[in-house]
Amino acid sequence: MALLQLLLFAMLAACGFSEEQTEGITIAYKVLEVYPQSRRVLITCDAPEASQPITYSLLASRGILVAKKVVHDSVPASFNINITIKSSPDLLTYSCQATSNSGTYGPSSRLQMYQELWAKPVSQLQADFVLRHGDSGPTVELSCLASSGSPPITYRLVGNGGRVLAQQRPLHGKPANFSLPLSQTTGWFQCEAENDVGVDSSARIPLPRAEARAKLVTTLAGELPLTPTCILAGSLVSIAVIASRMLSSTGL
């Protein structure tokens, strides 16, 4: 899995600049180096309409000044940023501002790199289910949760033949809960989780055959199957016999 993530980040590094532009100024970034615990990122700011010299400011969230550079030609200002894996999304939000004799440009759109730099594929998908009896017959209640994966994560209830029966996007870290009448599907069903990086599926859960569903309805309604009932009756008889012998031996 670690190798897969490194390959993903290497692909991001090989791609061109990701760019946002507003009010005459452009902010872009490119991943230069990928390390197991950090990234080296090049952020560029460009205000092509500003007269030279141009003073570029790289701002973090809440307008905090990160770096400043004066440019005397038409080349965009470049800023090298080292980012560690412990960096929070707040610290990976940047914007640019430029000032010159012709005025002030920006701030630019906010550049948020967290999802792209630290994205993790969905994994460790757990699916738990219970059978319940309702007014309209037996239903399957399924709970799906991926232990790992970058948000947002979309969960799907998939039925026989790959048909999507239901879909949810709960809050991150919360499970998706599905309820499905047994009469609406046959064969099997499973849970599927997907984010921007990948897809993961749970093991297939087989559904009872048609002839077994009538028995299932009776069981879920509170009636004991025949075999357990006989065992319980036999146990009660045995207890009664033992109790009678004990009373006889004490002379009561």
Swiss-Prot record:
Signal peptide range: 1-18
GO MF terms held by the record: cytokine activity
SUPFAM superfamilies: Immunoglobulin
Tissue specificity statement from the Swiss-Prot or TrEMBL entry: Expressed in bone marrow, spleen and lymph node.
A GO cellular component entry from the record: extracellular space
Keyword entries, A-Z: Adaptive immunity, Cytokine, Glycoprotein, Immunity, Secreted, Signal
KO phenotype (gene knockout): Mice are viable and reproduce normally. Show reduced number of both peripheral lymphocyte B cells in the spleen and precursor and mature lymphocyte B cells in the bone marrow. Show smaller and fewer Peyer's patches, lower numbers of immunoglobulin/IgA-secreting B cells and an altered gut microbiome. Exhibit reduced levels of immunoglobulin/IgA in the serum, gut, feces, and lactating mammary gland.
Upregulating conditions: Up-regulated in the mammary gland upon the onset of lactation. Up-regulated in peripheral blood lymphocyte B cells upon activation.
Main location: secreted
Residues bearing attached sugar chains per UniProt: N82, N177
InterPro entries membership: Ig-like_dom_sf, Ig-like_fold, IL-40-like_Ig
GO process terms (BP): adaptive immune response; mature B cell differentiation involved in immune response; positive regulation of immunoglobulin production in mucosal tissue
Disulfide bonds: none
Cellular localisation: Secreted
Function: Probable B cell-associated cytokine that plays a role in the regulation of humoral immune responses. Involved in lymphocyte B cell development and immunoglobulin/IgA production.
UniProt name for this protein: Protein IL-40
Originating organism: Mus musculus (Mouse)
